[in-house]
A protein has these predicted regions:
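ER/Golgi luminal nucleotide-sugar-dependent glycosyltransferases, focusing on the catalytic module
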Residues: 1-156
């Protein structure tokens, strides 16, 4: 761990904006309202960000970011993780280096995050932690895994 850096247990290039889908035609008005809202809050794919399920950072840096934020909803939490004003973007704008580490102790820069095998790639065999999203991926068949991998990283 270095000054002006953050180490995370997993990351993603995924975007809530790009992954938003109209599932039922009769919900089209709600879909467009949500799309309009998401365009204000989230960048399209690729949207590199650390997953906030596990990361290491100096408390003072974290508190500096959180000083004007409140989390009242799941959407607020999503904005902190992957929004235009996310923790990752705040840290990048302040010159931080952002890494993912895996269970082998290997460190990966942003352009190599996928290769850490910690989230939605391969069998995630090198994850340090487990959460519902990691467990869900493990339950998928190969075709479903390919879709998740594509939505997360843009490639299989």
């Amino acid at each position: 761990y270095e000054n002006n850096s953050v180490v995370a247990t997993s990351a993603s290039y995924g975007s809530l904006l790009t992954s938003l889908k109209l599932k039922k035609f009769y919900k089209i008005i709600g879909y467009y309202l949500k799309l309009f809202n998401y365009k204000k809050k989230f960048n399209p794919f690729p949207n590199p960000h650390i997953r906030t399920t596990g990361f290491l950072i100096k408390a003072s840096d974290y508190l500096s970011y959180m000083s004007d934020k409140t989390i009242k909803s799941k959407e607020d939490a999503w904005c902190i993780e992957s929004g235009k004003k996310s923790l990752t973007n705040f840290l990048k704008n302040h010159g931080f280096k952002i890494f993912v580490v895996n269970s082998n102790g290997d460190k990966f820069a942003e352009d190599k995050w996928k290769l850490s095998e910690t989230f939605n790639y391969s069998n995630q065999e090198k994850s340090i932690i487990s959460d519902k999203h990691i467990r869900k991926y493990l339950e998928l068949n190969n075709n479903e895994r390919k879709k998740f991998t594509f939505n997360t990283w843009g490639v299989y």
